[in-house]
Amino acid sequence: MFINWTMMLISFSIVFLYMFFMTFYFNIFFIFEYNLMSILSFEYKFYILLDWMSCMFSFTVLMISSMVLWYSHSYMSSDKNKTSFCWMVLMFILSMLLLVLMPNVFMLILGWDGLGLTSYCLVIFYQSSNSYNSGMMTIISNRVGDVMVIMMIIFAINFNSFELTSIKSFELIWGLLIIIAGLTKSAQIPFSAWLPAAMAAPTPVSALVHSSTLVTAGVYLLIRFDLLFNNNIFSAFLMKISLMTMIMSGMNAFFENDLKKIIAFSTLSQLSIMMLTLSLSLTNLSFFHLIVHAIFKSMLFLCAGFVIHNLMGNQDIRFLSDFFKFSPLILSCMMIGMFSLMGFPFIGGFYSKDVIMEFFFLKSNNMIEMNMFIVGIIFTFLYNFRLFYMLLLKGTLFNMMSKDSINIFMNYPIFNLTVYLLITSNLMSWLLLPEYTMIFLSFTQKLMLLFLVPFCTFMFMILLKFIKFFPYLKLNFLMTMWNLSELTSFIMLSNNKFLLKMSINDWTWLEMYGPLGIKSKIEHNYNFSMTKEINVITIAFSLTILMMIIVY
């Protein structure tokens, strides 16, 4: 079943790739329209938009999904519910395509809610209390974004149209609704706690849902509303949120020991870079980084799943060092992914990250924002250095195994994604990135970019010594996402207590004035009236007998 759907998704992805080249080269787009109903002067229409951006994103989603299903054929082979898992993944892909191809706010809610529902089902796929708690945190955080989209639909009625292309100006409330919806789906502060918690899902779900498709839906929504960032208020707000998220996720990734959570925090960091690029009004550059990041991050998750699967569930990086002696191909692919994450020359993220840094230093005049950006970039280097150090030099192997016990079948989709990363990053950089852009930087700023790598190495050695000499130091504030997890849990528990109290009040009111109350009142009045009637009959009968005695 997995292989059949893999081949079908690859076929559809090739169609979207052809559409991308055709729409991009000829600079055209296609809109398919179907009128569902019309009420008074308002028409409800079903749209499908095929332009170069939607076709490229759809191609990426389908290609990654096909590799994940191919990978799941081996990864989920012993699971009893693998058929249900396959159908849930396909429903998720359908919801993602609806979100990408719909230029209509009213139809956007179909894909948006479909993503939230299917991601919740996939997070709780492994039935345990941890999965249930993670799923509840995920769906509650995403419900905030759903409410924002519904309010967007209400406000769109003022424009007498639901089409995104017909909206040329944005009011303050409309813009805030769009930004908050994007922040919830892309897990930016203060909605960041759900993304690491969602790592309770199977690793193929993390590779597809929580690295390359679901979390990028918020960024894609903001890319579609790129006119929003002509307003300085929205740009400044999004820039500050993204900078804080970048620093927070980098700190947590450096102090984390769980392999999947480290990759999840790096996803959070890269999403904040995409948001930062959008705040600078660099739409094509943000979209390019979104595509490249989706490829290499899904590949990193599949590498992590390969390691975890063959080590019987162990995912602590302190016990994974010698494993890569048994699988040098996976180590090579993982190193390419991490080099791309750091912006190593001519690999993946290099083409976008270097340009993003230069544009940021060119356009930003705020010293605090520049320092925050540098700190975030430094932590990106640091947690990658630490991951290299623990996987290759420092750690020990938790479970020794023979080379024959390693499942080779999962190597093929990982290798395909690696080749796809190397080809796509070069090709997309030629097509999307600006050819002639004058970037004027001072001599100090140029040297700052060059000295980041040796400075990060020096900071890495200092922090390693710091952790070594203080092994029992409680870094709760840094390791719990600045207490966002506890804050989210507290709000959820407080809401539950409030709802419980309100439900008790509701039951009390229902008891008094609802159906039960009406029933009790009717019974009381009936019994009272029957008592009165019985008394009247008794008195009348007694008087009749008394009169008969007197007369006769």
Swiss-Prot record:
Domain of life: Eukaryota
Keyword Electron transport carried by entry: yes
Keyword Electron transport: yes
Topology of this chain in the membrane: Multi-pass membrane protein
Bilayer-crossing regions: 12-32, 48-68, 89-109, 147-167, 172-192, 203-223, 233-253, 262-282, 288-308, 330-350, 373-393, 413-433, 447-467, 532-552
Major subcellular site: mitochondrion
E.C. number: 7.1.1.2
Keywords: Electron transport, Membrane, Mitochondrion, Mitochondrion inner membrane, NAD, Respiratory chain, Translocase, Transmembrane, Transmembrane helix, Transport, Ubiquinone
GO molecular function term, any single one: NADH dehydrogenase (ubiquinone) activity
One GO-annotated biological process of the protein: ATP synthesis coupled electron transport
Compartments (UniProt record): Mitochondrion inner membrane
GO cellular component terms, semicolon-separated: mitochondrial inner membrane
Catalytic reaction annotation: a ubiquinone + NADH + 5 H(+)(in) = a ubiquinol + NAD(+) + 4 H(+)(out)
InterPro entries linked to this entry: ND/Mrp_TM (IPR001750), NU5C-like (IPR003945), Proton_antipo_N (IPR001516)
Similarity-based family: Belongs to the complex I subunit 5 family.
Job of this protein: Core subunit of the mitochondrial membrane respiratory chain NADH dehydrogenase (Complex I) that is believed to belong to the minimal assembly required for catalysis. Complex I functions in the transfer of electrons from NADH to the respiratory chain. The immediate electron acceptor for the enzyme is believed to be ubiquinone.
UniProt name for this protein: NADH-ubiquinone oxidoreductase chain 5
Source organism: Rhipicephalus sanguineus
Phylogenetic classification of the source organism: Eukaryota, Metazoa, Ecdysozoa, Arthropoda, Chelicerata
